[in-house]
């Protein structure tokens, strides 16, 4: 009778009921509630031939790249194209290091698309060339609010989770994690599962809040509500890539890692903890009654932002000086450059 009154418009459902209905309807959304992306890729190549890596592995043109006589991670120089970075030095043990952060991954996907290649093709080329996986991050985007980060944090506090590591950290504000994240001022409530010093840990945060702070996108209009990042280093990164290239099944690779390290349960006082029922929301997230998850791409074009910053920093001061010399001495250095 209560539902009939709501359906006929004689009664308005409560705010709490509307939230429940929206969440349940999201289960039947024809669009996949979850998508997955590469969000960080760092590979070291045991060679000093940076031109070979850029031309034959990345399949990019080194002539279009910016070159700088400094680097990070104790490398002495680097080449960049937008947010794609390749570091090198004279130290043979260091070799050549490729680093793609979030935007770098999106920009590189544009080049992969133009090359009629995909991530699997690139990773296979990298491994065949002796590439050493230093870090791989897989980001699972939650588009419908499957995950409830405060609820997961509370379950961690109450020890209602089973995993290899009991270590967790929950932050209400991104300001508290400024020494760990590049986008720390944008991240909303954030939960880390596992030791941050280990080769495997997870980071779950409110992506809709990040987009609100960064772009002003209203929370209710955000395409991605939460993001679950699987962060892998060294050997663990290698085994994940090997698994991807063996089975070509991103969902299997991602959730086999998650299930191996953590699962959230609901307390049942009369049972052993290992026999507690899997939490319904968590069960849905890891694959119970939802559409399958596939590796997706979200290519973004290269922008001139970084190039313009480089021109302002490296070139503009010299041009300004030449203009003054031309004006004072009657020379035509600027005209020669423009030709």
Question: Model-flagged regions — what are they?
Answer:
Residues 10, 21, 311-314:
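DNA major-groove recognition helices of helix-turn-helix
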Residues 1, 19, 302:
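Residues within the helices of the helix-turn-helix
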Residues 1-13:
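Recognition helix of helix-turn-helix/homeodomain-like DNA-binding domains
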Residues 14-29:
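DNA major-groove recognition helix of helix-turn-helix/homeodomain DNA-binding modules
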Residues 12-15, 92-94:
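Generic alpha-helical scaffold signal
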Residues 27-302, 307-339:
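Structured, helix-rich domain cores that form ligand/interaction pockets
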């Amino acid at each position: 009778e209560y539902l009939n009154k709501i359906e006929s418009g004689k009664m308005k459902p409560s705010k709490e009921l509307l939230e429940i209905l929206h969440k349940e309807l999201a289960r039947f959304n024809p669009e996949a509630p979850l998508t997955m992306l590469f969000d960080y890729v760092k590979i070291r190549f045991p060679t000093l031939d940076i031109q070979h890596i850029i031309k034959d592995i990345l399949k990019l043109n080194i002539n279009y790249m910016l070159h700088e006589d400094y680097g990070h991670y104790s490398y002495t120089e680097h080449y960049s194209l937008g947010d794609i970075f390749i570091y090198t030095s004279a130290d043979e043990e260091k070799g050549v290091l490729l680093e793609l952060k979030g935007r770098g991954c999106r920009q590189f996907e544009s080049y992969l698309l133009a090359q009629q290649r995909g991530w699997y093709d690139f990773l296979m080329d990298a491994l065949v060339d002796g590439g050493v996986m230093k870090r791989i991050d897989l980001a699972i985007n939650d588009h419908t609010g499957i995950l409830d980060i405060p609820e997961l944090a509370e379950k961690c506090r109450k020890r209602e989770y089973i995993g290899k590591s009991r270590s967790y950290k929950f932050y209400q504000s991104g300001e508290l994690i400024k020494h760990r994240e590049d986008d720390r001022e944008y991240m909303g409530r954030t939960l880390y599962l596992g030791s941050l010093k280990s080769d495997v840990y997870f980071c779950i945060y409110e992506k809709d809040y990040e987009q609100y702070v960064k772009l002003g996108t209203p929370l209710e209009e955000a395409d991605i509500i939460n993001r679950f990042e699987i962060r892998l280093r060294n050997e663990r990164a290698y085994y994940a890539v090997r698994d991807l290239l063996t089975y070509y099944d991103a969902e299997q690779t991602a959730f086999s890692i998650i299930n191996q390290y953590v699962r959230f349960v609901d307390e049942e006082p009369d049972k052993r903890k290992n026999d507690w029922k899997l939490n319904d929301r968590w069960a849905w997230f890891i694959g119970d009654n939802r559409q399958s998850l596939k590796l997706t791409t979200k290519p973004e074009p290269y922008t001139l932002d970084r190039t313009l910053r480089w021109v302002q920093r490296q070139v503009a001061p010299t041009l300004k000086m030449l203009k003054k010399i031309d004006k004072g001495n009657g020379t035509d250095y600027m005209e020669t450059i423009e030709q």
